[in-house]
Amino acid sequence: MGNLFCCVQVDQSTVAIREQFGKFDAVLEPGCHCLPWFAGKRIAGHLTLRLQQLDVRCETKTKDNVFVNVVASIQYRALAGKANDAFYKLSNTRSQIQAYVFDVIRASVPKLNLDDAFEQKNDIAKAVEDELEKAMSAYGFEIVQTLIVDIEPDEHVKRAMNEINAAARLRVAANEKAEAEKIVQIKRAEGEAEAKYLSGLGIARQRQAIVDGLRDSVLGFSVNVPGTTAKDVMDMVLITQYFDTMKEIGASSKASSVFIPHGPGAVRDIATQIRDGLLQGQATTTSH
């Protein structure tokens, strides 16, 4: 109907390429245009100005010999001012862009190790975008943005990488646990040392109090009971201590079987041994 009345409609965000007798004549903007077909004019085709996206999957190898699939996303559009170049100079725009993407990725990724490739995704995308912009601008296309969407290693490589990361995390956790246990043991040892120190002070003070009490008892008994000697008082004190010890052993619920002599003669022998030991110690101190 439009051709019958020599009129043609061009939709929004689209341009039409008009030819006259097979030769490029003009680029028609959106709207209604007169197209006298009897003068040899016709519409050769339409070209969209909308933003388009092309996803490219490229297989390549990294510097450390790991095969990866690099997924790039290219956003591009035709320039209205160069619509004739975009329409006539390229027969398959998407294939041309894909070829440039393959070329840049396969030139960039093999220079990088796998870990570096993940870290430098933006650098790879920038290299692809620069190359595409330089090449496609001559054909009337603008490269809006280039993204490296993903880098996919082989499934076995991904599994190995996950195992390496898991092992590293377990190693860190084990080191932290060992360090915590070390701190606990150090603190426990410090606490035990402090407890033993305080216990030693308590025992020393207890023994000093016992010695002071015995000394006072011996002196008091000697004064109040005429005719007694210090030896008699010491024998009495030792007997008292002996029976107190037996009483405590018998009263303890956790006591083991203890066999000790219990007759008066045995007490006398113990007293003699203690007294002789004290005299020998005193003699040794005096000789030195």
UniProtKB/Swiss-Prot annotation:
The protein's name in its UniProt record: Hypersensitive-induced response protein-like protein 1
InterPro entries: Band7/mec-2_domain, Band_7, Band_7/SPFH_dom_sf
Protein's job: Positive regulator of hypersensitive response (HR)-like cell death. May be involved in potassium ion channel regulation.
Keyword terms: Lipoprotein, Myristate
Iron is among the record's keywords: no
SUPFAM superfamilies xrefs: Band 7/SPFH domain (SSF117892)
Stored Pfam families: Band_7
